[in-house]
A protein has these predicted regions:
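Membrane-interface segments at or immediately adjacent to transmembrane helices
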Residues: 107-186
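Short amphipathic alpha-helical surface patches that serve as generic macromolecular interface elements
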Residues: 15-18, 110, 137-140, 394-401, ...
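Transmembrane and membrane-interface helices of multi-pass
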Residues: 1-130
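Solvent-exposed soluble domains appended to multi-pass membrane proteins
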Residues: 171-182, 186-189, 194-544
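Alpha-helix initiation and N-capping motif
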Residues: 46, 136-142, 160, 208, ...
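Short secondary-structure junctions and interdomain/linker hinges
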Residues: 3, 28, 56-63, 75-79, ...
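Membrane-interface micro-motifs in multi-pass membrane enzymes
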Residues: 32, 40, 129-139, 228-232
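N-terminal post-signal-peptidase region of extra-cytosolic proteins
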Residues: 56-59, 168-171, 260
Length: 544
């Protein structure tokens, strides 16, 4: 900083201010979501800072206010001392260029990165489990490691032959004779989760009344959906549900869509190949999570974001609830685009927005009273408002079910929650209610990394090896649409066949579940990692 700015006080202010801001951001993010601040957060959120400030739900720490004052005082002291670098720019800038080139060369290969980090007592950790990275290396060290390790780590055994060996024996499965080309509605419901699972908590009404009634019907499939998100990170399960790939071995906290730079096979592309109209509906900005750029590359042709929904205006009876486009408007939008495209089968992926955090004081008048004597005031506020939001989502689900039942065209709805909600800083509601303790075991991880899902159709679904009628299903994000494909008899690729066998060996798995697995099961996990690398960063041999 001093080499560029010359003046000591300015370098002090810029350098101290930057790292102070980064440290504060890390504190706020971890307090709200239990996840750390990553380098790619800077790139992804740079254009949304004005919106993001509305998501802050924890008090600004006094310690960080003191740190800001300290940086200011130091800058003033240096200013009056007159300290500066007494070298002209024509010497400073070339020297800086030499330093930059040397740094670039020293991290130009993965081997050099590892060697450089180890010399400074910093060690590469499992990129999917950043807790160990931050605990071992501290914030600055872990942040540096993440900057230098933003590329996906290549599996040691990756090659075209290795990919072929994994998929050897699997063949393309054509559609079944009874495949009716049904419309497919796939809904990611923001933070859809059952708050009645919080021990000792009472509710004046059941927030998931409709979900439970629909799940009890004879032709319905429901259960637990295992996700890689917690309190945020919608994009991870979203990516896995649409592609069948895993985010376990991508840099933790990254935006998976940033790696989809060319056409990539997905569950969506299977239906596009059958002549389906493919579209996405999301009542939020199109630039978030790089969706606008990535969706067409996995086969989604029509993109409808908040600007399209606002443009439809009165035609949808647009309403705002909880500071977002309401779930009622969201369901109206889905119905609108399905009715508009009734001349051909449709695959529609929708992401709701109404029940997005922050929850404190989200709704003017919460619909359901919530009580738990263990909750402090702020936690009770968050849980109460979340409960109103998830009740609205439950009504949205019922509306779509009624819509499907009144259609002549075969239609299937696949509905799931992306992650548990943030209910107070540091998992407050879950800890205060006793749902989780200070130490986690496998059961605890299953609780916090699973949400409800439901599959419903206006035609007989039957059963499959991955999904069956009833409420006791367990499915992973990357296998959900694989199971649906088998239910309706749509074509299945060799990769989808591989994932089904993976589920036979290990019914549900992601690295965040901390499951103890056998050596044989580990082979399937490693195979999934290799195939994911192949499609997002490798030669795409599995698509040939």
């Amino acid at each position: 900083a001093l080499c560029v700015l010359k003046k000591g006080w300015l370098a002090t202010a810029v350098y101290g201010g930057f790292f102070g801001a980064v440290a504060t951001t890390d504190y706020l993010k971890y307090s709200m979501t239990g996840d750390y601040f990553y380098p790619w957060d800077l790139a992804e959120q740079a254009g949304h800072l004005g919106e993001l400030k509305n998501f802050i739900t924890v008090p600004f720490p006094v310690l960080y206010i003191a740190m800001i004052l300290f940086v200011f005082v130091m800058a003033v002291i240096v200013f009056f001392s007159g300290a500066q670098l007494p070298i002209r720019w024509c010497f400073r800038y070339p020297a800086l260029a030499v330093v930059v080139v040397c740094m670039a060369v020293s991290v130009s290969t993965p081997e050099k990165v590892t060697r450089l980090l180890n010399k400074n007592a910093l060690y590469l950790e499992d990129m999917a489990l950043q807790t160990s990275n931050y605990q071992a290396n501290g914030f600055v060290g872990a942040f540096t490691i993440n900057i230098l390790s933003s590329n996906i780590q290549k599996p040691d055994n990756y090659s075209e032959d290795a990919v072929d060996a994994l998929l050897d024996g699997y063949t393309e499965q054509d559609k079944s004779d009874d495949f009716s080309s049904p419309d497919i509605i796939l809904v990611l419901s923001e933070s859809f989760w059952d708050p009645t699972l919080l021990p000792g908590t009472t509710f004046s009404a059941d927030p998931l009344e409709n979900y439970r009634e629909i799940a009890s019907r004879e032709n319905t499939i429901s259960g637990r959906f295992f996700t890689t998100g917690l309190g945020g990170g919608t994009v991870r399960p979203e990516f896995e549900v649409l592609t069948g790939l895993s985010t376990d071995y991508l840099p933790s906290g990254c935006v998976p869509w940033q790696y989809i730079l060319e056409d990539t096979d997905s569950y969506v592309s299977v239906y596009k190949g059958l002549g389906y109209k493919t579209m996405a509906v999301h009542p939020y900005t199109s630039s978030f999570y790089n969706r606008k750029a990535a969706y067409p590359k996995i086969g989604i042709d029509e993109l409808h974001f908040d600007d399209d929904i606002y443009a439809l205006g009165e035609e949808l009876e647009l309403t705002i609830r909880g500071r977002q486009i309401s779930d009622d408007t969201f369901s109206s939008t889905i119905e609108y685009y399905l009715d508009k495209n009734s001349d051909s089968p449709v695959f529609l992926f929708g992401i709701s927005m109404e029940n997005h955090q922050p929850y404190p004081d989200k709704f003017e008048t919460p619909d359901i009273e919530v009580k738990n004597d263990a909750f402090d005031e702020s936690t009770a506020n968050a849980v109460t408002n979340f409960t109103t939001g998830v009740s609205d989502a439950d009504k949205c689900l019922k509306r779509l079910i009624d819509y499907i039942d009144n259609r002549d065209r075969d239609t299937i709805l696949v509905w799931f929650g992306d992650h548990l909600p943030t209910l107070g800083g540091n998992m407050a509601a879950y800890r205060q209610s006793g749902m989780i303790g200070a130490e986690y075991d496998e059961e605890s991880y299953e609780k916090i990394y699973s949400t409800p899902f439901i599959v419903y159709a206006n035609f007989d679904l039957g059963d499959s090896d991955l999904l069956h009628k009833g409420t006791d299903n367990n499915i992973t994000s990357y296998n959900l649409m694989n199971g649906v494909a088998e239910l309706i008899g749509s074509p299945r690729t060799p990769y989808m066949e591989y994932l089904e066998d993976y589920a036979r060996a290990l019914p549900y798995y992601n690295i965040r579940l901390h499951k103890t697995i056998t050596d044989d099961q580990r082979k399937w996990v490693d195979g999934h990692r290799l195939l994911t690398y192949d499609r997002v960063a490798g030669g795409k041999y599995s698509m040939k």
